[in-house]
Amino acid sequence: MAAHIAQRLTVQEQEIRRLNEEIGRLLELGLQGSVEHSPNPVLEQLRAENEKLKYRISHLQRSLREEQERARPGQYGEPGLKDAAPVEEPKQQNNKAKEKGQATKGENSVGGKPSACEGNKKNEKKAGKEVDGHKQEGPCAPGFIKDRLALYETLKNEHDALLAARAAHQSKPIKITLADGKQVDGESWKTTPYQVAIGISKGLADNVVIAKVNNELWDLDRPLEQDSNVELLKFDSEEAQAVYWHSSAHILGETMENFYGGCLCYGPPIENGFYYDMYLDGRGVSSNEFPSLENMCKAIIKEKQPFERLEVSKDLLLEMFKYNKFKCRILNEKVDTPTTTVYRCGPLIDLCRGPHVRHTGKIKTLKIYKNSSTYWEGRADMETLQRIYGISFPDSKLMKEWEQFQEEAKNRDHRKIGRDQELFFFHDLSPGSCFFLPRGAHIYNTLTDFIKGEYQIRNFTEVASPNIYNSKLWEMSGHWQHYSENMFSFEVEKETFALKPMNCPGHCLMFGHRPRSWRELPLRFADFGVLHRNELSGTLSGLTRVRRFQQDDAHIFCTMDQIQEEMNGCLQFLQSVYKVFGFTFQLHLSTRPENYLGEIEIWNEAEKQLESSLNQFGEPWKLNPGDGAFYGPKIDIKIKDAIGRYHQCATIQLDFQLPIRFNLTYVSKDGDDKKRPVIIHRAILGSVERMIAILCENYGGKWPFWLSPRQVMVIPVGPSCDEYAQQVCKDVFEAGFMAEVDLDHSCTLNKKIRNAQLAQCNFILVVGEKEKTDSAVNVRTRDNKVHGEILLTSAIEKLKTLKKLRSKNAEEEF
């Protein structure tokens, strides 16, 4: 190998000499004078090739040195095993390493396989060795860390010198306006938000997570550059939480890099916490490793490593991260600017927009609680990554509350409730497709009937459309270009067909199958058709992520003048439905994404209409820039459940694109037959399956009476009352209720009542000889409230009234 590299090196050096001679020849021909003002293309190309070859030579020289080092006789009588020589450690520690499958004789730290970044990894570091003054606690410290830090330090010194020069020569007085309107004086390129916070109070400065400068999140130690409006955000701000958890992800990334030695990928904050993905080349992550990872994180926190921001050119970053193909992909595919930013904490340097907390010591308590496998960017044809999840807080009290919340959420898990209450199940022979049992089907049908009843009130027309379409339909709609990977497709008679993942193109065919008049608009099509989406098997999760589902899907075809009224109607519709469930909600306006279809003027008009509707609705709303669908802006609605979690279900989308793609027209009042309608995509429940999961967990299996799968349990006092109990059950069932009768003679009366209460039966009707004689029932609830004896006919009428009203507390109101 060394001989091969040396041979390549000789060839490259000869090529450079040839290029230098050619450059000299061109310069002698008189081109030198024109280079400064109008460079000769041939000369410039030769120079570029020259620079590339110099870089290759540098790389080959480094590779040659490393190959020669590896070629030296190994310590175990085998050539080339220098890197694999075991680290000398106390015997006890070495045994622990063996137990955990860490680096031992002839192996590295990743289960005996080459490290994910082995091609750029130098001698495996001894546990506890320092790199640039930072102690590496893990079983390995990859060699690329040292090279990465060396380049970073050079660039950081240049950056600091530039910043010092700006502070010395460009600084000027600035006005800093605080959130309360108060103004303080500062100096550009010198005054930082942290200094502003200190000027107010030390307590404030200690509790501030991040600053917001002129509506942009800003590092606390980053100097202000001009007159600024400054907000100081604490952890109770959602934006501050995202920053806090993002910084925590970097701590986890530093730990994973040193512990596993793999290639870091993405490490973002999420709704509750953070995660980091790492490529480990086939090696997995074990929960047994969590304590070691947490201890390393605690050590990093204790060091109070500062977060440093540095803007670097893309070319230099490709050099800095050459050991990591994933970071290079991000740079090549995602970064379209000449420069971007990296952040450093300790030995970790990572591509990152930031901002971050001041130092790692701001993370007071951190817990690693879960791991999973995923694909690079969610694509099944790409590399498998290992993902580790964590959570962190600024005090231990919040961590304790979070742990209690997790326990409560675990008890409310819809998969557990579905199993315990016999609502539904899944099977490997149809992954991602739910089997709803009778009780689950009752919930499903009750929800759809609820929405259908609202359709009658709000003048929606229910339709039914095909499940399978020729791919030409999806090409026409634009979905084939943007969404075909998520569709189930197949060949029929040499034509490609696909199961529909949404209803809108079919509804466009229904609108356009005959001429339409302005008198028909608005035309509101509603459809509960079955939809299929080819979700990756690794992402399937109970009812929240499925392949087969139904939506309360509707599309409103209207004129431009009708948009405002229709949008208001949609918002009022969702408000009335969520009120029944007891949900509060948040509204988010999602605007034009990068991959949008259509003209920007149409997008601007659509966004303006949605904003106007939201303002008129009167509820608070937030802007979510760039998160709209590719065919139009939308309003996303997030509901809040009983334990404080948010879920996105409803959506309202304005679409100017599909009417154009399907050439939909109507005849206007003045006779113009080329007028284009507007489409409003609308769903309230969203996926019925997902809504059932949310309701399961929201109610904790304690269903409200109108929706409950076990509304009435009839219990006879003794065998002599069995026949009457069965008749009562039959009458209640025929009146439209989910009714059962307990005829188990092995249980006492009290045991039967207790079983019914534990099964969350809303009402328990006890019948004995007296009730049998009087055609009555003795009513009690699952919460053991006794309503006493009442005629069966009266009881059924009361139950009907409570069901019709969809009462939240029917048991109390009976």
From Swiss-Prot:
Gene3D superfamilies: 3.10.20.30, Anticodon-binding domain, Bira Bifunctional Protein, Domain 2, Threonyl-trna Synthetase, Chain A, domain 2. One of its GO terms (biological process) is threonyl-tRNA aminoacylation. A motif (Nuclear localization signal) lies at residues 798-804. Residues 62-142 are annotated as: Disordered. Residues 2-72 form a coiled coil. It catalyses: tRNA(Thr) + L-threonine + ATP = L-threonyl-tRNA(Thr) + AMP + diphosphate + H(+). Keywords: Aminoacyl-tRNA synthetase, ATP-binding, Coiled coil, Cytoplasm, Ligase, Nucleotide-binding, Nucleus, Protein biosynthesis. Its main location: cytoplasm. One of its GO terms (cellular component) is cytoplasm. Its EC number is 6.1.1.3. The keyword Transmembrane does not apply. The keyword Protein biosynthesis applies. This is Threonine--tRNA ligase 2, cytoplasmic. It comes from Xenopus tropicalis (Western clawed frog).
